[in-house]
Amino acid sequence: MKSAVVKDLRSREEKRQAALLDTRARTTVSFYRYVQIADTAEFRARLLAKWSELECLGRIYVASEGINAQMNVLTDRFNEFDAWVQAQPELKGILYKSAVEESVPSFFKLAIKIRPKVVADGLNDNTFDVTNTGAYLTAKEMNDYIDDPEAVVFDMRNNYEAEVGRFEGAITPDNLSTFREELVKTPELLKIHKNKKIAIYCTGGIRCEKASAWLKHNGFKDVRHLKGGIIDYARQVKEEGLPNKFKGKNFVFDERLGERISDDVIATCHLCKKTKSDTHYHCKNQICHNLYVGCDDCLKKKGGYCRATCRWVNKLPPDTKKIIARHYNRYVRKYRKFEKTRLVGV
């Protein structure tokens, strides 16, 4: 089914500038659901038509197994947005997780993509039931697990996420940069704790929900996951006056790149490797676009580049950059692979 929505042909920078100039209040929310979607193309077209009409922005993944959405909705049209969402059979009763911070526009465009899975997991096991998940944990229960010496708390996020923020005492993925890598290895990583109580967590809940089902599939009996992830944990802690046991920032996959959960700064600048910082930047060299943690001094000295080579490459003529792009990216990937083993705890 083709969408009647007119394609937005503006460049990314043009969309970004338009969003920055739009002074209307917006609300950033995320939601997901594992639900059977028979016709993903029709479902996508339905979402695109309505959400374009409502001027929504965001990044949404649709698959036969469900939906994963991070969105930016006009505040004065949120009730209209919610009423329409709740009227869709696949989405009825869905709950939203609101952003902790709204410092800058979280999204500059609306992108709804059909994917094989709502979260790339690297699994190819027809016997795996993604709906057979572990029980939920509230924020209070999560705190109890953290305080329990017999319980294990495991971070289902990537290493660069855990680097800037994590729960006290959590086991973190020191050299794993994708959920696909981590999920496959999680049963092996946790096998020595198989008979203990295990609590897993992620940003908004979707990754640890699937991970809890995967651990149960691999014989783990007592696996629970934090309902609503770190985002909803922060809300519950604030509303219920609970101790906050999450230290640092919650990394988010939008233009903000993070939400401050506590005042603790637990990461170190990747460039000088001395100054404490938890601010992420993308390398100014668009061929590289490497995500790195930088301090104010290094940002000023390096000009927004993650390495001297990137500054040099960015000064080359456009045609020359196109020629070297493939080889340069291969070099950068190799460099990053080396760096991954040195991120957490630097």
Q: Which positions does each model-derived feature cover?
A:
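Internal catalytic-core helix/loop-beta-alpha segment
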Residues: 134-148
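Short hydrophobic beta-strand that contains or immediately precedes a catalytic carboxylate
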Residues: 152-156
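Structured helix-beta-strand junction loops
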Residues: 54, 148-149
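Substrate-contacting helices/loops that form the catalytic groove of nucleic-acid
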Residues: 203
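Rhodanese-like catalytic fold shared by cysteine-dependent sulfurtransferases
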Residues: 2-135, 158-197, 206-346
